[in-house]
Amino acid sequence: LSTGTIALAESASGSGATFPQNFMASATVAFNAATGHNVSYANPGGGSSKGKSDFKAGLTDFGGSDSAVTTAQAASFEWAYIPYVAGSIAIAYRLDEIKGTTLSLSPATINGIFGGTITKWNDPSIANDMKTNPAWANTQKKSALKGASSVWSTPSLNTALVTVTLIPSVLKSSKGKTVELYNDTKKKSVKTATIGTKGEIAISGNVDSASSYSVKVDGKVVGKYGVVAVNLPDKAITVVYRSDGSGTSNNFCNFMNKAANSDWAVNDAFTSCIPGGSSKVASFGSTFQGQSGSANLSNYVADTNGTIGYTEVSFVSDATRAAKGIQSANVKNAAGKFVGPTAAAASSFVAGAAIDATGFVTFDYKQTTNTTAYPVVAVTYALGKTAKSAKNAVVSDFLTWILSTYAPANAEALGYAPLSGAMQTAGLAQAKKVNSK
């Protein structure tokens, strides 16, 4: 950097949504290294409600939120929404008794679990969901390549869609190497793909329930899958929800309201969303546990057998948590397909959304012909000031850089989905509103 560039370096701080925490931790470091500025995002962010209140109070230069700003939450100064990245909200669980099996859950069953009417893991609703989708288990608890994880789903009876995610450092060292779906029983390769610039690599191949399969990255086994007979345990379900004001809760509750049960409200507070409200949650006692922030919720699920919660998928694929047995369920979409929480599946769902003139995104939960969509998704926003200032100029540059450069190259590797097409174009237009007046 030149002396002139360093002299013009600015600091800008943000707080709020924990949904994009893993993305922002990486993006701020990369932006600062490239520009000499000092953009920071609080870790933990405090949740979307805090992001909105900090921004309104002038405590930050930009806010972080995954949910709409209400009239009461709105700042008195002019500001804009800037949607900058999306991601899947994983239905995360740990159930050691099913030995690595991926759960398949319909919206109705998720409604029952999080609404407190399904209280045991062997409930017929869960069993029936599992019967409608082949039960494949990953028997490899720890990936042989740290920083590489895999998701297995079966779009049809004899077809597997395997998605491998590589964190940025592993992606960099693995470029040009091979991802392989290998039939261990028949000792032959089913499908391969070459690793390029994207951190998420999907391969589809024909499979049969009598064989077991390995998913390999450069010969290292990152997952080992086979069909299993599922014996769901007679065990109490512990629901883990966000206790802070959370955009992840807001988007999860919106999914519940639109896809399963209109009695759910849409709110940053889970206890205000659930039918029956906070008194209902209190009546469940210790079977409902509140945790503040995405990391704490994910840690609780990873550390506690029999639990289920909701969190951005990067917190589940994290190697340390994954080794403890936390997994993500496949969720039934409006087209009737059980789909895993991959970046591609999130992007497929977001492609069916609408974005208004303010930059706010409205999802369509009735995409009955979209077989590839994962239906529990959030778009996360920065809240930026339109007034001209040196700090606001940096915020505008930072968000423009994320949308145009950083997210397209790195979001998938970090467990997120970059905005593309009309959504990316709208996001860039919103970023230009920051520092425009």
Language model features: what each stretch is:
Residues 1-8:
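C-terminal segment of classical bacterial N-terminal signal peptides
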